[in-house]
Every structure is written in structure tokens, then in C-alpha cells.
Amino acid sequence: MSLKPFTYPFPETRFLHAGPNVYKFKIRYGNSIRGEEIEDKEVIVQELEDSIRAVLANMDSLQPFVTEHFIVFPYKSKWERVSHLKFKHGESILTPYPFVFTLYIEMKWFAEDLPSGKPADDIPLELVLAETEAEEATMRKWKRKLMEEPSSPSRQGPHRAKMETSSEASSNKKPLKESKRSTDEEAQQEYQDTPASNAIAVKEQDAALGHGLQGLVVPPLQHSSPPPPKEPGARGFLGFLSALFPFRYFFKKSGQ
């Protein structure tokens, strides 16, 4: 299988056939790839060809691997609408492989600068992916737990306590209103009873003042008696006559 030159460091898609099959490869380069870092382009072409052969030899169990200059992360995904495609090589019809191979390529020093500080040859590259996947799974589990906690029975205690507290607060408000109403009634009753109590208090205060001021002589008040009502003149004259000569005497004489 002879390959055409690659477009390194630019991404590309290649259709390669081996025997009666056609394979689709996507080559993608990471941010660590710089075209001027490797002057010998033939070395790059050889390493990329060897990477493709390694993927085809282990297509059922893909694992990251290392070349002289690169780290290759191979992935496999479903080839969409592959049934609508037809491939021919000369007169022979080729069968497309139903999966697409994607190669993510980084420079080798990218693994040497990992936080672990260990050399790339001693670190299985799949460990980096496994750690990333584990972190993502942990985050998903944590978010799911946060979403499920409010609806779980164990989390209903504070809500119930909050509801009970609010109900107690509302029940406490009712006696306050009743006590306020009773206080208003008592104040009104006290206001109605105030004149009698004030009169008693005034009498007691006067008695106290009289007891305390015994040395003082208070002149008695002079009450002027009102004149007797004047009767009309006719009534006074008739009364005078009736006093002298009773009418019964005149009526008695006339009857005889």
C-alpha cells in the first residue's frame, strides 16, 4: 500500500484501501504541532504511515501509542451513510469499512510536560484518557446527586421543618390579634368606667386636701335663696276671697 504525501501540519481526510476494503482516516494535529520543529519531512511521512498501519493492525483494540516524534491518539466512530457510497479500484468493487478512524497527533514533549513529571515512555497514554474520563464521570455523578437530593426523602426534613415553623408562626399570629382585640375592649371599658372612678378619686383627693389643710379657714359660701314664684294676680285675689269666704258657703246658701 503506497501512500501519497501528507499535508502535515494541516488536517486532512484520506481514503485508503487494503485488499478488498476501503478505510476512511481523519488526521488531526494538536496545538503542540509546529511545522518548523521537524525539518526532515521524510521522517514525518514515515511515522504517519507507520501509525496508519499500526491502527489497521489493531482496529479492534485501539490504544494510544508513541512514535519517535509524535503521540498518536486513535479513535473509531461510525461512518454515516456509508451504504450510499461505492468504491472501485480498477474493475474491482471495494467494500467500505463501516467505521471512521480519527488520529489525534501531538508532539512527544507534550506528554513529557504532563503534571505527573514522569517520562512519556513510562506512562501508558491510555492512563491520561482514563483519568479524564474518570473526572468527567465523577462530575456527572456529582451533578446528578445534586439534582436528586431535593426530591429524596432524606432531604425532606428541612422543608417539613420550615413548613412547621411557618405554621407555628401563623398560629402565633392569631393569639396576638385576639389579645389585641381584648386589649382594645379593656381600654374601652376602662374609658367608660373613668367618670365614676374619676369622681371617687376627686372626692378622695378633696378629702386628702381637707385633711392636709386643716389650719386654713375657708369662708362658707353664701347661697342666695331663689324668690318664691309669683302667682298670677287673679289666682291671688280668688285665693284671698276663698280664704275669707269659702265658696262652699255661698253655694249652700243659694241652694236653700
Swiss-Prot record:
Subunit composition and interactions: Component of the MAJIN-TERB1-TERB2 complex, composed of MAJIN, TERB1 and TERB2.
Summary of the tissues where the protein is detected: Specifically expressed in germline tissues.
Subcellular location: Nucleus inner membrane; Chromosome, Telomere
Main localization (coarse): nucleus
InterPro entries per UniProt: MAJIN
Cellular component per GO, a single term: nuclear inner membrane
TM region positions: 233-251
This protein's name: Membrane-anchored junction protein
Alphabetical GO biological process terms: double-strand break repair involved in meiotic recombination; homologous chromosome pairing at meiosis; meiotic attachment of telomere to nuclear envelope; meiotic telomere clustering; oogenesis; spermatogenesis
Note: MAJIN was named after the 'genie in Aladdin's lamp' in Japanese.
Keyword Cell membrane tagged: no
Bilayer topology annotation: Single-pass membrane protein
Organism: Mus musculus (Mouse)
Nuclear side: 1-232
Topological domains, Perinuclear space: 252-256
Positions with biased composition (Basic and acidic residues): 175-184
Consequence of gene disruption: Mice develop normally, exhibit no overt phenotype, but are infertile (both males and females). Gonads are characterized by the absence of post-meiotic cells. Impaired localization of Terb1 and Terb2 to the nucleus inner membrane.
Keyword Nucleotide-binding: no
Function: Meiosis-specific telomere-associated protein involved in meiotic telomere attachment to the nucleus inner membrane, a crucial step for homologous pairing and synapsis. Component of the MAJIN-TERB1-TERB2 complex, which promotes telomere cap exchange by mediating attachment of telomeric DNA to the inner nuclear membrane and replacement of the protective cap of telomeric chromosomes: in early meiosis, the MAJIN-TERB1-TERB2 complex associates with telomeric DNA and the shelterin/telosome complex.
Gene Ontology MF, one: DNA binding
UniProt family annotation: Belongs to the MAJIN family.
Source taxon at top rank: Eukaryota
Bias kind Polar residues: ranges: 164-173
This protein's UniProt keywords: Chromosome, DNA-binding, Meiosis, Membrane, Nucleus, Telomere, Transmembrane, Transmembrane helix
